[in-house]
Amino acid sequence: DRYHPQILYFDWWIQQEAAKPYLKKAAAYYYNRAAEWNEEVAIDYKFDAYMFGTAVPDIERGQMADIKPYFWQTDTAIALNSWCYTENNDFRPAGDIICDLVDIVSKNGALLLNVGPKADGTISDEDTAVLTAIGDWMQVNGEAIYDTHVWRTFGEGPTKVQDGGFSDGVKKNFTGEDFRFTAKDDTLFAIALKVNDNGEYHIRSLRMQEHTAGTVYHGLVESVSVLGTDDAPVWTRDENGLHIKTNYTSDKPITFKIKLN
């Protein structure tokens, strides 16, 4: 009541029978109070503690392998070995976290990222560096993340993501053929999870084929641009895919903004 939390996060054990009556009371009170506050809120849970559809299912340190028709969440930490500040933490590279974020959002999920402060409340230089790098990327590519929704398919490419929790320590060796898709209005965002040195990209989900051949998209591609640069890429489209050539490069994922019609 004092702080009006936007998220009420539960960890494990609450799926036990002894906790069930209290979960219902907590949810009813929280949701009713949120309605009085006129705020959108969420309850995060694990292990089927809540009935499906009444709260947000959470996967700890892991992801979904495929797109889901319902909203879900991943919770993980900047460090692989700890949730709190620890000397000599094994910090995850910002690029790896960004790839996970993009993959999660493309599958109808959200990322809850933990940062462990020191005892005096300050954030370590290592944490700050990772957060700053993520923020810099979001400044350029946030349009493909915020206020978007899933497309017809979450993406394409050879690299598979392990389904389930406690797998974020498994290195995902994404390639320049791995794309994740998000959408908004008449725009498709195709995010390449790794930059190709030659600047050439081929999005096979946008190939031109007959409806009998399992085509993902039958409409028109009006334009293609790259977030972060004013230089227009060269692009063509045929029965093998949408082919893009750009001089823009980065050490993190890049986003193609594709206008559809």
Annotate each language-model stretch with its function.
Residues D1-N261:
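Mature catalytic domains of secreted/periplasmic carbohydrate-active enzymes
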